[in-house]
Amino acid sequence: MQKTMTRHLSRNRKPHEKVSHVPRRGPRTYQDPCDPGWYVVNSRRGVAPQPTPTSGSLGRKPYNPGCPSRKWTKKIIAAPKHGFYSAKDHGYWVPKVQAQKKYNPPRKVVGGGRSYKDVLSTPAKIQIKPTPESILLAQKIQNSTFKSRGKVTLSQEKIPLINRFQELLIEKELMEDVEESQPFVANDSRAQHLFCKKVLRKVGRREILVCPITNEESHVNLKTGIKARIVDSMGSVVHEENIPAYNRGHVVKSMRKRIVHERESKPIPVIGSFSDRAIRVLCDDHTDELASASSVPSEWKPSKNQRAVPCLLQNESATVVSAKPDWYAPVKVCTHKQYMKVQRVFLDAMFIMRALRFHIDAKILRETWVKCWLQVHRKNVAFPGWMIAPLLSGTVPCEQEFLLPRVNETRAFATVCYA
């Protein structure tokens, strides 16, 4: 008997044949598409459940009215919304679910207590102890914007950020000597590590050069060797086939990455802490009277017909500033994509300035830097703090920032940048 049974079960059945030993499912008593899963609850009243009679006896009453039947009490069940069908209770047992209390953030106090939402939604204030140079520079920036967004808040009563260019007082004898840095020359030996040393590998019958790290085939010809030039004082390496593009001023990306839009550039680590929150630059009327006109290059001076328009406060009526010039729009907080774009511009500018800093005079370098920022500023985006801070501290990516000691000088990692 046992044998025939097993043979019967394991026999290959034809697709149209009914499987005898699998019980037929009752109808789905629980179908809520919003719920994480489907639960199948087999009703206990035969295969096709009859509607429960409303009149007359419903059968024996359960011993535990209002309570779940004994079979559920020892288990913790994730029950569907309408509970489980229980034969003993003649119906559905709906578990009593404790309602989760919604978290209410503390309300705003009239005295100016700030909830976390306020902190997240209000623009950050730049907290830098202003030096005369940084104030002058901030005023230059204010004047220079053709579509001027006005005043940058320099708040003195707030805790200042650590200026990353402050000289650190460190005993000279504890510091190791730093050799004087020479600008890179063409094909400098110091940059040899930048050309990845390729290794011969046999692939099939061919011997090819392979980069030992990334394991990919080199485009370098075995006979001619590496064709690349060091193009600037930072020891940047450009391969020969990319040189025309480099000369045209394109940013040369390495094609090693599948995603082309991802840059190689990494932001420079900074001493001190800058907030990454976007900084909104508010508008102010009196910008052009502040800086002396002689100190500002002529192309930075605001033209008379476009002067900065004060921002409308919330409580002011719109009639106060009736005729806004057509370029005027309040500063928006940027999206992530815009932020990345601005960051790319920033980093590109940073690298260009870095490359130029042995070749041009510091003042021109600084002006170029600020002008480069005006290009971004006119695009009407909110700056993140780490971008605007170097502007306000009156610094540029100049030789001091990149920690290159001067001739016979030993110095710590954070240095003064003279504005």
Curated annotation (Swiss-Prot):
InterPro entries: SatRNA_48
Top-level taxon: Viruses
Ranges of compositional bias, category Basic residues: 1-27
Region ranges (Disordered): 1-66
Family per similarity comment: Belongs to the nepovirus satellite RNA 48 kDa protein family.
Protein name, entry field: Satellite RNA 48 kDa protein
Origin species: Tomato black ring virus (strain E)
